[in-house]
């Protein structure tokens, strides 16, 4: 809703055009980028978001996921990706079901999965 500069449809974007990609958190991410807000462990990621994350990961682009959006990394990249949702126990169990690894950290820290080039920050989690 708040943007600076040009905004375009994700369907027209390609990961190769970017040096890195950041996904915001908050309720908007949990209900618009994916269905986690409504479906929890049964969530689906919006198709263009999933395509873009997979494309960026395949191109070894750094990916940042904040607040609740690490569930997107956990669902799309799944097996072995290391993420954090802060100290949130219930959601940590959900991402483990998908094959991701959750590491609890303080809200003032970040977690870097160097192998996958994925950075996650808990924000309010």
List where the protein language model places each region:
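Active-site-adjacent pocket-lining segments in enzyme domains
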Residues: 3-125
